[in-house]
Regions:
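N-terminal beta-loop-helix "entrance" segment that forms/cooperates
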Residues: 1-8, 97-101
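Pocket-edge positions in alpha/beta enzyme catalytic cores
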Residues: 2-5, 61, 105-108
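Helix-loop-strand module that forms the ligand-binding subsite of alpha/beta enzymes
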Residues: 5-81
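Glycine-rich phosphate/pyrophosphate-binding loop and the adjoining helix
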Residues: 83-136
Length: 136
């Protein structure tokens, strides 16, 4: 590609990522990995990711909640300069986990999501301070 993929970027998405201090990626497991479209999106926004916090949630209809997807994705995220938090959320048996309004029906999952979000916010704040105040 002559323009190093610049023509494939979505300007609105790039601007949103640039303004964000952290990202949440929710993706299904696809052939023991993450979907190709997610890889495409990640590869077309390289500079916007450096020193940003990211949390990952896996989704599956089965009992593992996208564990293999997360395991495949984390090294890619680190290579892009994103900082992964240590909490992941595995939405296993996703078809039974949410009610008709999209609310989580299992209180244990609600607690996991709360821990996940708290850790993501903490890491995003720390990294924002670093981006704004420390030399790279």
């Amino acid at each position: 590609m002559d323009d190093a993929g610049e023509s494939l970027k979505d300007p609105q998405f790039c601007a949103t990522v640039q303004r964000a201090d952290g990202l949440i990626i929710v993706a299904p497991e696809y052939n023991h990995s993450f979907p190709g479209l997610l890889k495409h999106v990640l590869d077309t926004n390289l500079t916007e990711y450096v020193h940003k916090a990211v949390g990952v949630c896996g989704v599956s209809a089965g009992p593992f909640g996208g564990a293999r997807m997360i395991q495949s994705l984390v090294p890619v995220l680190r290579e892009l300069g994103l900082v992964t938090i240590f909490w992941d959320v595995y939405f296993s048996n996703a078809g039974q986990l949410f009610d008709e309004t999209g609310q989580i029906t299992d209180p244990a999952y609600s607690r996991r999501v709360e821990k996940f979000l708290n850790e993501l916010v903490w890491m995003a704040r720390v990294l924002r301070y670093g981006r704004e105040n420390l030399p790279t």
